[in-house]
């Protein structure tokens, strides 16, 4: 009440007294306040007052670290001099002075220097780990985006080459058709397959065009290097010659068999129940050369390999006659006069035509010297392949091409490449055989080629039968 009354008195004076200006009034009131508070005007320093308030705020916000380290150094010096405390005692008292409304307060903190260092070290390590983890994550995301973009462009881009290759390659396998169905609809797959196919000539082979020639009694004029490779026999081996195929990304083997009467059909020991490995067939039959032949029925994808597609004829008798594969072609066999015959006929019709050994597959690649018309990649993609052919001079050709070895750049071949290789070496009649993991070539009991299955594993599988060259 007293303060309120004094203010009222002061304001009442404003009306009682007369002032020349406002400054005179303010000056008088300042003098009155100074007198009442007994503080000389000259002693009031507002800058110091503001600084004092700022210092209080700082002291409230954090402890005085300078005083902490100074007191710590002094204490350590005293400990070394007096030698009264253990060196293991790393705890020191941290004294900080806090001011609150002009009052001084002192608080003591216990700090462990080693523990603080350890915490800081662990924090730095965690930060580094997080940064490294973040870098790895960013790198993975970037790589994923790049690969995804490339794959998307290949799968759905304007150039259909990769799409056609993937669909035709996958759809001609037994176990990996899902690779095409993952990315494309049935409609797209059908459209691609319709644009990639093999159109056979429709002719049956004219065996009269094949005439055996004994080159040992004839002067030879080589037409090209391929003919020279065929006709130049290995020293001491008049039965066959192994020729390496190494052109671009193509790797494989061609065998020239000089005596076609030695070419025969051999079946797995338990054909009808389970297949047999090619090496086993070759050794069991004492064959100098062996190559896979028929495809096989495999509804459960268990690679049993025991039931061949179509007809199988051995020594002039039908030993198997199951459903045909939807691969074109037809009967592939040798007549009793040792000529390769290709024709769309039944097993009985083949027997009537004098066929001694045969199997069934396709497509036919060359008939009577005329290559089949191949649209696109032929609808078979690229993979390991096997084929059989015969030249006009009677020499038989076994061709086995490796594939799926992408690490070494060996993709395999399609129908186009297979036909070209056979044509270069003079095939007059030729047909595709079962391929993929089944493709195999055994020379003198040893697997010569490098088969790879659809999963990239280096292995072959059991098959129902094989073309062999007896010793």
PLM region descriptions:
Residues 289-293, 342, 367, 429-433:
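General beta-strand structural signal in soluble alpha/beta enzymes
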Residues 249-254, 328-329, 382-387, 464:
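Short glycine-rich loop/turn motifs
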Residues 269-274, 347-350, 401-406:
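Short, solvent-exposed aromatic-acidic interface loops
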Residues 261, 338-340, 394, 437:
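Structural signal for glycine-centered tight turns and loop->strand junctions in beta-sheet-rich domains
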Residues 296-378:
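Active-site-adjacent helix-turn-beta-strand microarchitecture at beta-sheet edges
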Residues 303-323, 372-429, 433, 438-471:
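Conserved, well-ordered active-site substructure
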Residues 3-7, 15, 22-25, 29, ...:
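Zymogen propeptides
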Residues 1-122:
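N-terminal targeting leaders characterized by basic, low-complexity, disordered sequences
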């Amino acid at each position: 009440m007293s303060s309120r009354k004094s203010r009222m008195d002061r304001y009442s004076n404003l009306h009682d007294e007369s002032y020349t200006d406002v400054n005179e009034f303010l000056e008088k009131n300042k003098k009155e306040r100074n007198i009442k508070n007994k503080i000389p005007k000259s002693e009031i320093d507002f800058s110091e007052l503001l600084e004092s308030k700022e210092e209080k705020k700082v002291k409230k916000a954090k402890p005085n670290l300078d005083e902490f380290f100074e007191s710590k150094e002094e204490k350590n010096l005293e400990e070394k001099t007096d030698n009264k405390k253990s060196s293991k005692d790393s705890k020191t008292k941290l004294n900080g002075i806090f001011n609150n409304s002009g009052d001084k307060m002192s608080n003591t903190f216990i700090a462990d220097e080693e523990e603080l260092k350890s915490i800081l070290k662990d924090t730095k390590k965690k930060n580094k780990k997080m940064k490294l983890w973040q870098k790895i994550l960013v790198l993975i995301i970037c790589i994923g985006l790049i690969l995804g973009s490339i794959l998307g462009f290949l799968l759905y881009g304007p150039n259909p080459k990769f799409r056609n290759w993937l669909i035709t390659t996958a759809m001609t396998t037994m176990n990996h058709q899902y690779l095409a169905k993952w990315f494309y609809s049935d409609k797209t797959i059908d459209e691609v397959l319709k644009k990639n196919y093999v159109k056979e000539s429709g002719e049956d082979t004219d065996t009269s065009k094949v005439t055996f020639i004994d080159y040992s009694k004839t002067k030879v004029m080589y037409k090209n290097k391929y003919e020279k490779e065929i006709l130049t026999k290995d020293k001491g081996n008049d039965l066959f010659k192994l020729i390496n195929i190494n052109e671009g990304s193509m790797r494989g083997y061609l065998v020239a068999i000089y005596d076609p009467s030695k070419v025969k059909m051999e079946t797995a020991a338990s054909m009808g129940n389970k297949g047999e490995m090619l090496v086993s067939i070759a050794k069991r039959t004492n064959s100098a050369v062996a190559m896979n032949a028929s495809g096989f029925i495999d509804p459960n994808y268990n690679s049993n390999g025991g039931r061949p597609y179509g007809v199988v004829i051995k020594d002039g008798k039908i030993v198997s006659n199951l459903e045909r594969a939807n691969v074109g072609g037809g009967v592939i066999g040798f007549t009793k006069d040792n000529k390769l015959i290709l024709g769309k006929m039944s097993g009985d019709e083949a027997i009537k035509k004098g066929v001694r050994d045969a199997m069934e597959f396709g497509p036919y690649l060359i008939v009577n010297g005329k290559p089949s018309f191949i649209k696109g990649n032929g609808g078979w993609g690229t993979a390991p392949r096997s084929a059989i052919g015969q030249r006009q001079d009677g020499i038989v050709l076994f061709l086995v091409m490796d594939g799926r070895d992408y690490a070494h750049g060996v993709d395999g071949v399609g129908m186009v490449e297979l036909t070209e290789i056979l044509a270069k070496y003079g095939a007059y009649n030729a047909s595709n055989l079962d391929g993929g993991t089944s493709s195999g070539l055994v020379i003198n009991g040893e697997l010569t080629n490098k088969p790879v299955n659809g999963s990239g594993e280096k292995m072959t599988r059991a098959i129902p039968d094989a073309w062999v060259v007896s010793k």
